[in-house]
């Protein structure tokens, strides 16, 4: 298309999140709509609709988002044909699969157990639709109709877990929907975190961005991971905000001969990183390689 459409989380002083929509003709300068396109309505999301990720399949937009009730961060689903009028389908994992909506101990062999984040792969694999989801560890689920999802494993058997001694040693989380590369592999941007020393004997969490590769012939496993993060907190916006030291990627689009990766900075602002789409990605923070905040997301 001739525009980039960005769905983003924003909140006012009450820190109750809504999802807004903004458009851009160049991928860097955005005009946002005055009213949110998705707001809390139900008990499971009464304190926020967060972390939007959208996939378009056969003219329908499938939006996964986090419903937050200040106890549990649930993976939820909504659909639309015009990006403005949405039908909410509620939490994705319920009933027998509600184990993914519990908040397990922070430090377990497999991290935390919120369903939270999710991305839908825009093409079928092995005759089914696939979703990757999870915060703490990454899991997979399949569907016949894109609305009803069945996890492929239990909470104790994730497909991807934190790597000891690495930038994601305490937490891994879904980033962007996978893209199919010329080599036939799916590449997905991810988020990782580790604890670092804080003040007065406490600790802080440092979020960085990674990548994993998945073979569509074996979509239930990670084939390879990037050993070093491609994006780390560096700028003032990355290191100062509602939650400090966070670069957190959620959107990826190919536009104008570039890959544009949209990421959050310390839960306060949004920015974009770019890579040349004609070759191997070498990420920079804006078209000229300099830091660039493109949209305030604080209400």
How should these model regions be labeled?
Residues 1-47, 56-170, 179-242, 256-299:
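Beta-rich carbohydrate-recognition and catalytic domains
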Residues 173:
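ATP/pyrophosphate-binding catalytic subdomain of soluble kinases
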Residues 252-254:
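Electrostatic interaction modules used in gene-expression and signaling proteins
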Residues 244-247:
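Low-complexity, glycine/alanine/valine/leucine- and proline-rich hydrophobic stretches
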């Amino acid at each position: 298309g001739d525009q980039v459409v960005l769905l983003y989380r924003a909140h006012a002083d009450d820190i109750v999140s809504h999802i807004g929509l903004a458009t851009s003709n160049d991928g860097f300068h955005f005009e946002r709509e005055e009213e949110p396109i998705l707001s809390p309505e139900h008990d499971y999301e009464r304190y926020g609709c967060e972390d939007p990720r959208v996939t378009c399949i056969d003219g329908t937009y499938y939006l996964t988002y986090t419903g937050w009730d200040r106890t549990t961060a649930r993976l939820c689903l909504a659909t639309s044909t015009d990006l403005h009028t949405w039908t909410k389908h509620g939490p994705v994992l319920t009933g027998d699969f509600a184990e993914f909506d519990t908040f397990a101990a922070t430090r377990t062999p497999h991290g935390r157990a919120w369903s939270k984040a999710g991305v839908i792969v825009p093409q079928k694999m092995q005759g089914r639709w696939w979703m990757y989801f999870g915060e703490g560890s990454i899991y997979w689920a399949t569907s016949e109709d894109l609305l009803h999802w069945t996890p492929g494993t239990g909470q104790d058997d994730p497909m991807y877990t934190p790597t000891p001694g690495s930038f994601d040693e305490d937490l891994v989380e879904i980033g962007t929907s996978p893209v199919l590369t010329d080599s036939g592999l799916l590449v997905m941007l991810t988020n990782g975190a580790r604890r670092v020393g804080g003040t007065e004997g406490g600790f802080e969490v440092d979020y960085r961005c990674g990548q994993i590769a998945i073979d569509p012939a074996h979509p239930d496993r990670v084939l390879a991971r990037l050993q070093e993060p491609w994006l780390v907190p560096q700028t003032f916006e990355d290191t100062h905000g509602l939650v400090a030291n966070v670069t957190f990627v959620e959107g990826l689009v190919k536009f104008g001969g570039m890959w544009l990766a949209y990421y959050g900075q310390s839960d306060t602002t949004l920015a974009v990183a770019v890579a040349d789409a004609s070759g191997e990605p070498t990420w920079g923070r804006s078209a000229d390689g300099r830091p660039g905040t493109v949209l305030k997301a604080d209400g």
